[in-house]
């Protein structure tokens, strides 16, 4: 078990999401990004984060695809990461401990390939955009949800000049 391997201390609090929620500040004209002034991680902490992301990536791809966004976010910040990255890793481990019985259910369907996709403009570090997608088999009315065939959660390498380009 990955949680035992990483000597994870279980929290009494239940974690409902794999990453921390950043509340939206309505009414502001400009939404500023948070600056991370925390100290950088040590080499041992970087190795720990790499081991956790590597171990949980298999589980996330196979069973709990909700972890993919958090894993992608943590993995992109690992080399220049700070203690905030380490806290995000511990949050992900708390989520995994709170939700140990993930499952995917496949049911008989009309075999219609459905796709939900989206992109977020300038959401990732270094002014990059993020893309996400969810492909599954279901019915033509999109009322039947089935287990995923492909889940995409990645950062687009190139900087887009407008919000329409990543879409």
Give names to the regions the model predicted.
Residues 1-167:
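Long, low-complexity, charge-biased intrinsically disordered regions
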